[in-house]
Each structure stands twice: as C-alpha cells, then as structure tokens.
C-alpha cells in the first residue's frame, strides 16, 4: 500500500479563517488544508467552525493568536511560502515567539512561559464570541 498525502497549496488558496480566497463561501479543514495529524485536522475544523459561527452571529471572524498552537498552525497554513509549502503538525516552531523583553532560563522555562501565555491568549480568543463558544 502506498500512502498519498493530498493537500492544497494553502498559502495560495486559504485566508486566515480557512476560507477559500476565490470562494469565500467555502471553508476547508483537515488534512486537505496541509496539516498532519488527527488533532491538527480536528483543530482546523474547530477553527473553521468557530470563524463561521462568529460571522453568522454578526461578529468578526479571526484566527487564534499566533502565540498559540492553533494560531501558529493557521499562520503556517496561510503565511508560509507558497513555493515551498509542505504539510506540518503542531510544533513549537510554528508559534510566534515570546516578546523579546521576556526573560527566562533555559528551554523548559521558556516553554512553560509560552504555554502560560498561549492558554491566556486562547481564553481571550474564546471570549470574543457571544456565548464563549471556543
């Protein structure tokens, strides 16, 4: 059996709410967007659905902050070079770095601080939709 990973060139075709640029009435999620992994595929579904709900209730659709795992994944899908785009799962490298003013000792402390910031930013992102639907 041969495994074939089929995906679109997401930076070329998707906006940051996972809509097709040429068909904004359609959103994509899952492996076809260029994510790898079950969690990542489900996460893109959550993001696409949340953005759709935000628009339907009269709000503004926007992706999670790039300092979060979900936001970093969206940023990878929509801001990578379309010439070299390849699927990815969530890694620390996808997330926007901590502010330059942040001080910490070592990788463990840096990741702990990043995780704390990401949780807070994700909470705030979730609260931007009426009913706090995350």
Predicted regions and their residues:
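A glycine-rich dinucleotide-binding beta-alpha-beta segment and adjacent secondary-structure elements
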Residues: 1-35, 42-43, 62-79, 85-91, ...
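Generic hydrophobic secondary-structure packing signal
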Residues: 37, 41-44, 114, 118
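Internal hydrophobic alpha-helix adjacent to the cofactor/substrate pocket in enzyme cavities
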Residues: 41-64
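Predominant activation on well-ordered alpha-helical scaffold segments within soluble catalytic domains
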Residues: 43-50, 74, 119-123
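Non-catalytic terminal regions with compositionally biased, polar/charged low complexity
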Residues: 60-67, 126-131
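C-terminal auxiliary extensions adjacent to catalytic cores
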Residues: 88-134
């Amino acid at each position: 059996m041969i495994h074939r990973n089929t995906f679109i060139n997401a930076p070329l075709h998707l906006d940051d709410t996972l809509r097709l640029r040429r068909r904004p009435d359609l959103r994509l999620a899952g492996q076809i967007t260029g994510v790898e992994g079950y969690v990542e595929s489900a996460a893109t579904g959550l993001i696409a659905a949340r953005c759709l709900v935000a628009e339907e209730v009269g709000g503004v659709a926007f992706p999670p902050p790039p300092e979060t795992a979900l936001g970093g994944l969206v940023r990878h899908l929509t801001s990578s070079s379309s010439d070299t785009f390849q699927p990815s799962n969530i890694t620390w490298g996808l997330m926007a770095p901590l502010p330059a003013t942040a001080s910490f000792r070592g990788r463990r402390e840096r990741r702990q601080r990043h995780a704390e910031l990401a949780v807070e930013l994700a909470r705030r992102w979730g609260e931007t939709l009426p009913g706090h639907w995350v």
